[in-house]
C-alpha cells in the first residue's frame, strides 16, 4: 500500500457533476493517465506534479465532499487515501477504463465516468 501519491494540484471548488453537483468540494487532481485522448482538458496532469504523503493530502481537505480526479486517479494505489478519507463523501472521476470493483468495499466512495 502506498503512503504517498503523485499529486498535480489540490483546490476547492463547486462540484459540477455527479450526485453532489452544486456543492462545495475539495478536488485532488492526481497525476498520470492510462489514455492519451486528443481532446483531454487536463493533459497537463499526465506528467506534472509532486509526490505528497497521504497525511499531507488529507490535511488540505476543506470540505466533507472530496473529488479525486486526474488524469486517471485509478492509475495510482489510492486505497490508503480512501481509508484516510472515511467520514467524507468521495467521488472518483474515472475514464471508465479501469476496474472499479476493488473500491466497492468503501461505503463513502462513488464514481463518475468522465471521458474528457
Q: Where do the language-model regions lie?
A:
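Conserved Radical SAM active-site core
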Residues: 5-11, 24-31, 35-108
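Short secondary-structure boundary/capping segments within folded domains
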Residues: 16-20, 32
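Non-cysteine beta-strand/loop elements that form the S-adenosyl-L-methionine
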Residues: 109-116
Amino acid at each position: 500500500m502506498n503512503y504517498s501519491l503523485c499529486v498535480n494540484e489540490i483546490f476547492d471548488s463547486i462540484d459540477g457533476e455527479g450526485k453532489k453537483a452544486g456543492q462545495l468540494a475539495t478536488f485532488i487532481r492526481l497525476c498520470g493517465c492510462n489514455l492519451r485522448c486528443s481532446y483531454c482538458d487536463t493533459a497537463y496532469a499526465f506528467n506534472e506534479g509532486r509526490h505528497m504523503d497521504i497525511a499531507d493530502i488529507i490535511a488540505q481537505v476543506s470540505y466533507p465532499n472530496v473529488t479525486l480526479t486526474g488524469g486517471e486517479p485509478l492509475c495510482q494505489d489510492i486505497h490508503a487515501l480512501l481509508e484516510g478519507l472515511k467520514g467524507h463523501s468521495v467521488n472518483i472521476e474515472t475514464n471508465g477504463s479501469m476496474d472499479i470493483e476493488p473500491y466497492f468495499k468503501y461505503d463513502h466512495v462513488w464514481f463518475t465516468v468522465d471521458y474528457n
